[in-house]
Amino acid sequence: MNPSEMQRKAPPRRRRHRNRAPLTHKMNKMVTSEEQMKLPSTKKAEPPTWAQLKKLTQLATKYLENTKVTQTPESMLLAALMIVSMVVSLPMPAGAAAANYTNWAYVPFPPLIRAVTWMDNPIEVYVNDSVWVPGPIDDRCPAKPEEEGMMINISIGYRYPICLGRAPGCLMPAVQNWLVEVPIVSPICRFTYHMVSGMSLRPRVNYLQDFSYQRSLKFRPKGKPCPKEIPKESKNTEVLVWEECVANSAVILQNNEFGTIIDWTPQGQFYHNCSGQTQSCPSAQVSPAVDSDLTESLDKHKHKKLQSFYPWEWGEKGISTPRPKIISPVSGPEHPELWRLTVASHHIRIWSGNQTLETRDRKPFYTVDLNSSLTLPLQSCVKPPYMLVVGNIVIKPDSQTITCENCRLLTCIDSTFNWQHRILLVRAREGVWIPVSMDRPWEASPSIHILTEVLKGVLNRSKRFIFTLIAVIMGLIAVTATAAVAGVALHSSVQSVNFVNDGQKNSTRLWNSQSSIDQKLANQINDLRQTVIWMGDRLMSLEHRFQLQCDWNTSDFCITPQIYNESEHHWDMVRRHLQGREDNLTLDISKLKEQIFEASKAHLNLVPGTEAIAGVADGLANLNPVTWVKTIGSTTIINLILILVCLFCLLLVCRCTQQLRRDSDHRERAMMTMAVLSKRKGGNVGKSKRDQIVTVSV
């Protein structure tokens, strides 16, 4: 290529170099591990709980039912997405964090206990030997031996509590005897006896004293009268048949400020039969010496001998267990289970003997001779929700408080029990009413005004809503995965139960004796009975939940729409309710329930259903640009004029852009020509006119 051709060739376009140092510096600072800046309102989110997932599923199902949409995984996901997006996108109003809303809440099965009262129904007390102690049998107690005897300090309220022991307000223990006659014919031996001695409940008033109200039909229970003769049994001392009966008169077990407790079961003891006696006969009541002799410690005496010139008779025939009940100031049911706890506190002793007739000083002489070589240890147990508090229990009637320091929580009583302590029957609380505070108003679910606020935020911050929506979708995938895993686990647990049931059926083949099978069936029946009792409490709690309208963001307990009024229910009343007190200063639960149920009914019509979904649809329709145009002009002519104006403006912008681009090209060519001319050393000298023209025209 010659120099002339090089001169004719246009020089290359020079690029405009920018200063890239600041951009490079910024790129060097960018790292993927850098944390995002947290805004002042940002809060650390906790992982979703199972209760929140369950509540989210319930709300999504409810919305689909109200809108009559088929429940498919896709529709459930979209419904859950809508709910989560509404909650996430809701702007926090100014001053909302400082607001305080206090409502009544129902907490089912809190970690609290209360004393079992005389007005409660009898509880289930299980024994390990139903031959000598009647009642349901269960030889697997205690269920958790490692938890027996845990220390506890209690201070709870009461209203006629059930307590056993040597303390005011508790039923006192004593030894009681039950006698049966063995049919043996002998000229010397009048009667042959089998007797059982064990711990029972001590009468405070002699049962032979005639009280007018004792014979009143108002307090006499309905039942079979006790026999007039001593029950006759077989010679087998290993069998004792218990039969409930009602004695001719009642005994008073307690009559003080804690109430009047009576018992209509027979209280058998030996006494002198003075009928037909011409000489001076001792009192028909039990001899103090005899009573003292028979009620001494069951461990010291293994031989009893009663001698007299008068015949010995056994009063109050019948083999029946005590069934105490309260009759004043309130009336309650019978509680036969208390005796099963008392009799298990000491082993029972089995006696065998007879009554012989001799002649001394030409007079008949009667001797009762009893011997014992057999004792049987017993065990009585309760099952949840019931427990036994054992220790130095103090009942304070002035403050209606039961206190016990360093007490033990037990479920079983056996022969190692020390009667220097007392026994208080307690159970888990079914539920309590407490005021709770929230940082927002009570809502049954994300309501219409929340949807409206969200839609306003969508219209004003569209880009922010898109990013929020993406984040919500990603979060909801994790939530859905968690729920799916939980569903699989639940399904697996059901299969495990079936597997256990199959194994349980197969395990019955390993039982080799009918007694073992009977014991297993008895245990299963007892488990079923206790389960029914426990399920009854659960059903009562569910009944309350169904009748109440609860806040949408709670599932473990129920926050009701009833506002807490401190002037009407001060905190001291709530505290006494939590302690289990039932006096005039305690919270009136029945009245409070009526108010809360009425408030729940008033909010039933405010639950957002189809109206809420319609509001969402209307709000989303506002995102259509056509609706924005319609808001400016409502006629077609005006809309057409607006469109023409927009097109004219667009055309004007395009023409201006093209003109600016042509001017820029002309300037750039002129600059290139000047650059070429300035680089020539000799200018145009020696060049022909044609070359000059060619060079310039390039």
Curated annotation (Swiss-Prot):
Domain of life where this protein originates: Eukaryota
GO molecular function, one term: structural molecule activity
Signal peptide: 1-89
Region (Fusion peptide): 465-485
Annotated Pfam families: GP41, HERV-K_env_2, HERV-K_REC
Function per UniProt: Retroviral envelope proteins mediate receptor recognition and membrane fusion during early infection. Endogenous envelope proteins may have kept, lost or modified their original function during evolution. This endogenous envelope protein has lost its original fusogenic properties. SU mediates receptor recognition.
Ranges annotated as spanning the membrane: 632-652
S-S pairs: none
Misc remark: This envelope protein is encoded by a human specific provirus.
Summary of subunit composition and partner proteins: The surface (SU) and transmembrane (TM) proteins form a heterodimer. SU and TM are attached by noncovalent interactions or by a labile interchain disulfide bond.
A GO cellular component annotation in the UniProt record: plasma membrane
Residues glycosylated per entry: N100, N128, N153, N273, N354, N371, N460, N506, N553, N565, N584
Cytoplasmic side: 653-698
Keyword match Ribonucleoprotein: no
Originating species: Homo sapiens
PTM characteristics: Specific enzymatic cleavages in vivo yield the mature SU and TM proteins.
Keywords for the protein's UniProt record, in alphabetical order: Cell membrane, Cleavage on pair of basic residues, Disulfide bond, ERV, Glycoprotein, Membrane, Signal, Transmembrane, Transmembrane helix, Transposable element, Viral envelope protein, Virion
Family: Belongs to the beta type-B retroviral envelope protein family. HERV class-II K(HML-2) env subfamily.
Listed name of the protein: Endogenous retrovirus group K member 9 Env polyprotein
Region of interest (Disordered), residue spans: 1-47
Ranges of biased composition (kind: Basic residues): 10-20
Residues exposed to the Extracellular side: 90-631
Record site feature (Cleavage), residues: R464, F465
